Each structure stands twice: as structure tokens, then as C-alpha cells.
């Protein structure tokens, strides 16, 4: 059964006003399936995985565009970068919006080539795995914890018990694993990691020892939901700190991790500056850390980190699926007081705590560390916030903050 992706509306809108559309994202998140469904047979499909097609695109790009005429869907465009300047010449000559739909992995070289060749002509959107809202059939929309949005979401969403939510967290967001068995889960991620090591890692960086990079990948998974410490990560992976920093950028370029930068403001003078790292798919992180089922993960030492990772990525997807750059940050001061998520939207900041509890009553007191941003020339409003938790219902904490059941994300 096809599950409607929230990015569909954004793609149709952008395709109507831009000559080229690029959908990026990690392997196997459904980029091709999404675009082929939207095309409905009305555009030619070619994939650069086909060596004959790729050879033509790389050796005779002009002839390629004579053979495959727009409207055209080109899969894995990063494998044929020489085609991009010819796409530019074609769209400049013909000027039709939506002539080219492209998919590609979110890699350094791809984005650099696209930016150079198609600047001003291309719209770029990013697709990750299924969101909870997509699987549950909820409406699309950027998650901002304001009363109208929360009340609407509470009417359409179910309150998930902790066990059910951790089943979703453990299973992950890959479309191929929707309703899969535990054995399928293990086999899938084993193959996924092997493919990533053999194909993507070699493309993105010079790594001679796949086993060493695998150790790094597992070590990085242990940091999901945590502020990154490159020296400690490097020691655990038995590499140097500069290498750890570079390899983490590789994971980010491949779309496997998201680096959440600290929220910065001139009035906040004592905040840490290191990013936090989140695996974009909690199932992959669980596999790398050998959490063999949801029950063990829920009871394990990293359950809170996995809940935070899941919540942050759900909110991230809610923005990116609307075609917006997610306005996310976090704030932690030198006294270790932390607001897990700060949304900076339309001149207001929305603080969010994330807790594996049903009624974490003291969490909103930490939001006071953000009050200095409401003063001075660059003042921001302190907007609605809340605690994402396992409350039995959407409930107000005070005039501005809410207990937000995790199932409403």
C-alpha cells in the first residue's frame, strides 16, 4: 500500500514554478517511488544505475537529451555530473517549468555541481524516511507548538502508549520496513550498511579500511541525541579527532545524521557552541548499537536519547516536507541547563523539552534561561512551548506551555 508523502504538495508546487526539481536524501527513503507516482507515466524515466544510460550521459550528454526528451525524470543524477551543464542549456533555451525532475544522494559533489550549473533554475527539496504523521495519516504542516495547531492535531491523532512508540522508534522510518518482521529488519539494515560502506563511503571520502569506518559509524550512533565531543568519538573509533570531524561530515552529506547547531543570540553569552548529532533514522542507530527489539531499547540506557532523536527528526521532517529549512536549534549553558529544542519562527522562539515521562512538571523552568532574548534591539518574542512526553492528553501547563503527547508529532 502506498503511503502518501507530505512532500508531494511541495513538489507539485515547486515544479510549477521552477525549470528543474531535485529531490535529495539518503538511500532507500522513497525518492524514486515518490516522483514516479507523481509523474503518473507522463514523463520519461531513466536511471543512471543503468551503465549504458550512464555511459551515454557522460560521454555524449547532448545526444542523451536528444534520445530522452523532457519532461524527464533522471534517477541518481550524481552519477552523471557532466549532464548538468547540458540541462542548463536546455532549460535556458526552452524555458518550460518542470521539464526535469532529478533524484540524488545528498553528497558534497552533487550539491556543488548543482549549485554551479543550475543556480537560479533549480528547486531542491530533501526527503527522509516516513514521518509518524505520514504513517498515521495525519495532515501535513510544520510543527509549531501553538494552540491552534496542537488542538487540531489532538483531534486527528491517537495518543500512543510508550511501548507502541518505542516499537516505531526501533523499527525506524525506512519505507521497506513498514510492517516488516524482526528478521526482515535485521537483514535489511545489514544490507543497507554494507551498501553504504561499499558505495557511498568510497564516493564521499578516501577510506581504505571499511572496517575502521564501520567502527566509527557504530561509535557515532552511540552519540545520537548528544552533544558531540570529537576527541571522545575519535578515541572510541580509534581514529584522530580531525578524521572524526571529517567523517561525521560525510555522514551528514549522505543524509544519515543531522547536526543540530546551538541557538545563538547576542544576549545569550554563556551557551555552548558544539552541535548535537541525531541519526535521521532511529532504526539504523538501533541496528548499529545492537538493540535487538523494541522492548530492550525501551528499557535500555539510551531510551531517552532515542526518544529525543525521534522527536527532533519528526519536527525536522514536518518543516522539510513543507519545503522549509527547519529553523531548529538547541540551547545549553555552561551550567548544563539545556532546552532540547528551540524553534525560531517569525520572530518568536518556541522552547521544547523532550522527556520519557508522563508529567515532567519541572521542565519548563529551564525555559527561563532564554528570557534574555526578549530584550534589546534584536529582541525576539518568547512564544508557545511545551514538553514532549507521554502525557495521556494534550494539557496546558500554564498560559504559554503544554504537555504534548509524543504521538501528536
Q: Model segments located where?
A:
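Conserved P-loop NTPase "ATPase switch" module shared by AAA+ and STAND
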Residues: 67-83
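Conserved catalytic/switch belt of AAA+ P-loop NTPases
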Residues: 84-108, 115-117
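Interdomain hinge/linker elements that couple catalytic modules in large macromolecular machines
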Residues: 132-133, 137-314, 320, 324-326
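A cross-kingdom feature that marks ATP-driven nucleic-acid transaction machinery
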Residues: 1-28, 32-48, 68-70, 249-250, ...
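A short beta-strand-to-loop transition that corresponds to the Sensor-1 phosphate-sensing loop
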Residues: 103-107, 113, 128-130, 388-392
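Conserved alpha-helical scaffold flanking the Walker A/P-loop in AAA+ ATPase domains
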Residues: 54-72
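Short regulatory helix/loop adjacent to the ATP-binding pocket of P-loop NTPases
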Residues: 108-124, 136-141
Amino acid at each position: 500500500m502506498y503511503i502518501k508523502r507530505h512532500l508531494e504538495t511541495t513538489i507539485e508546487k515547486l515544479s510549477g514554478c521552477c525549470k528543474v526539481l531535485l529531490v535529495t536524501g539518503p538511500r532507500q527513503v522513497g525518492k524514486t517511488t515518490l516522483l514516479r507516482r507523481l509523474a503518473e507515466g507522463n514523463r520519461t524515466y531513466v536511471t543512471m544505475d543503468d551503465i549504458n544510460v550512464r555511459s551515454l550521459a557522460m560521454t555524449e550528454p547532448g545526444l542523451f537529451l536528444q534520445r530522452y526528451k523532457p519532461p524527464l525524470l533522471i534517477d541518481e543524477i550524481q552519477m552523471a555530473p557532466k549532464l548538468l551543464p547540458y540541462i542548463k542549456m536546455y532549460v535556458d533555451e526552452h524555458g518550460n517549468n518542470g521539464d526535469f525532475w532529478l533524484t540524488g544522494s545528498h553528497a558534497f559533489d552533487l550539491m556543488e555541481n548543482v549549485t554551479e550549473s543550475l543556480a537560479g533554475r533549480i528547486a531542491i527539496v530533501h526527503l527522509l524516511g516516513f514521518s509518524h504523521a505520514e504513517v498515521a495519516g495525519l495532515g501535513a504542516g510544520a510543527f509549531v507548538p501553538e494552540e491552534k495547531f496542537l488542538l487540531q492535531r489532538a483531534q486527528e491523532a491517537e495518543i500512543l502508549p510508550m511501548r507502541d512508540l518505542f516499537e516505531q522508534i526501533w523499527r525506524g522510518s525506512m519505507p521497506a520496513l513498514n510492517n516488516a518482521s524482526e528478521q526482515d529488519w535485521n537483514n535489511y539494515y545489514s544490507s543497507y550498511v554494507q551498501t553504504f560502506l561499499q558505495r557511498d563511503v568510497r564516493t564521499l571520502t578516501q577510506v581504505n579500511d571499511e572496517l575502521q569506518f564501520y567502527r566509527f559509524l557504530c561509535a557515532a550512533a552511540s552519540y545520537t541525541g548528544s552533544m558531540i565531543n570529537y576527541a571522545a568519538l575519535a578515541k572510541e573509533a580509534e581514529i584522530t579527532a580531525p578524521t572524526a570531524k571529517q567523517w561525521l561530515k560525510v555522514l551528514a552529506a549522505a543524509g544519515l545524521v543531522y547536526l543540530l547547531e546551538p541557538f545563538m543570540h547576542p544576549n545569550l553569552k554563556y551557551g555552548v557552541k558544539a552541535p548535537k548529532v541525531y541519526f535521521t533514522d532511529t532504526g539504523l542507530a538501533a541496528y548499529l548499537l545492537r538493540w535487538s527489539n523494541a522492548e530492550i531499547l525501551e528499557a535500555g540506557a539510551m531510551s531517552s536519547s532515542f526518544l529525543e532523536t525521534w522527536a527532533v527528526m519528526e519536527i525536522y521532517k514536518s518543516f522539510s516536507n513543507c519545503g522549509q529549512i527547519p529553523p531548529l536549534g538547541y540551547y545549553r549553558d555552561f551550567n548544563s541547563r539545556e532546552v532540547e529544542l528551540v524553534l525560531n519562527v517569525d520572530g518568536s522562539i518556541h522552547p521544547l523539552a523532550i522527556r520519557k515521562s508522563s508529567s515532567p512538571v519541572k521542565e519548563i523552568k529551564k525555559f527561563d534561561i532564554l528570557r534574555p532574548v526578549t530584550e534589546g534591539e534584536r529582541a525576539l518574542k518568547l512564544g508557545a512551548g511545551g514538553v514532549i512526553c507521554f502525557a495521556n492528553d494534550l494539557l496546558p501547563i500554564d498560559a504559554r506551555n503544554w504537555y504534548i503527547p509524543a504521538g501528536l508529532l
